[in-house]
Amino acid sequence: MQVSRPLTVSASPKGLSGRTRVPGDKSISHRSLMFAALASGRTYVTGLLEGEDVLRTADAMRALGATITREGADWVIEGRGVGALTEPADVLDMGNSGTAARLLSGILSSHAFNSIMTGDASLRSRPMRRVTVPLAANGSEFLTREGGRLPMAIRGTGEAKPIEYRLPVASAQVKSAILLAGLNAHGTTVVEEPVATRDHTENMLRHFGVEVDVSRIDAGGRRIALTGPVQMTARDVTVPGDPSSAAFPIVAALLVPGSDIWIEGVGLNPLRTGLFTTLIEMGASLSIENERVEGGEPVGDLHVRYSKLKGVDVPPERAPSMIDEYPVLAVACAFAEGASRLRGLEELRVKESDRLASTVALLNVNGAETEVIGDDLIVKGYHGPLGGGTVQTHMDHRLAMSAVVLGLAAQKPVNVDDTAFIETSFPGFVDLMNALGAGLTP
């Protein structure tokens, strides 16, 4: 059982300053391990996020027959080939990682063996039906707890049928699970999404030699298709810095007077940079320098300086490009001049916690004024001193880091009930923030 780590956060005594790098992108790290295990040959991965979530994925792929070792700063994966994974001898424990659980469900559905998947208390409370229902169309079977929750037994099929599915709600995880099931299916798998979601799966499949066809449909939607079964060839991967992790020092620097920081090597996939666009609309001094391409993904260095922010109206179609950043964006909105409206946040209700409700609670207990109308969050802007509350994080790493950011800029200390789960996505978060001058004392 993980030991809790409460933390009291007081305003930073001076502006944040310096240059830093955030850990590797979590989405790309998960996929690099999974795809390398499905490829034929040896893959070297540089910059892998070594957080608990990603290490669970490494353990799962080892249990399925891949050889995964660490050599210096690199991770080395000896792949099995598509369709050649082997039945695990034990339960696959995905810890806190919904991404790993959902993507791996797609892979397991088209392998002819049985497996059982579980997770921690938080993951076991999250619904899986929006993945298992479309996946079952390929001939696989899923047995879950009531409400479609883990633990889950999966009876994969060696004669997987191709799936054609239109997502009712945009979700990169559901899209990816279906595409991964299609790698070992006979025929063309098609996923249609109402708005474009992060496309790391499509990019990395191409990197490993898979032909993926992407076309535009409707108003901003996309059709993604691939024809299986495929062969994947081992290719080395360089993982860029995670823009979702960069969000926390970015917002902290914008809110703490006198701050001036650089964050190097951050991934700039256009389907992941909605937060940067939004902050600039709010008046943030945030610039991108030294843009380049590494491992098939755009990368750049971010320069961030303290800024007086103004309220913003965020359209719902931007949600997929910043779905993990809404809690820390809401913190920024609480310090802004004027009200902000963050629209179309239904996806937040099925994250590690009900992130919409948890974000509202985080703000309200620290003196901010909020209102929820349907799936929209309204933050009424700065109306007086903030802080002084205790934040219940519900084992949600992003909520915990958002609370820390609020505390660094608030007039009164903020108590965070548990920061232990930050390690799932951002190992070394406190040390990184302290190196910039945050003055956090665990």
Curated annotation (Swiss-Prot):
Gene3D superfamilies: Enolpyruvate transferase domain
Polar residues: bias regions: 1-11
GO cellular component: cytoplasm
Keywords for the protein's UniProt record, in alphabetical order: Amino-acid biosynthesis, Aromatic amino acid biosynthesis, Cytoplasm, Transferase
EC number: 2.5.1.19
Binding sites annotated in the UniProt record for phosphoenolpyruvate: 26, 98, 126, 173, 355, 398
UniProt keyword Transferase present: yes
Highest taxon in the source lineage: Bacteria
UniProt binding sites for 3-phosphoshikimate: 26-27, 31, 171, 173, 324, 351
This protein's name: 3-phosphoshikimate 1-carboxyvinyltransferase
This protein's encoding gene: aroA
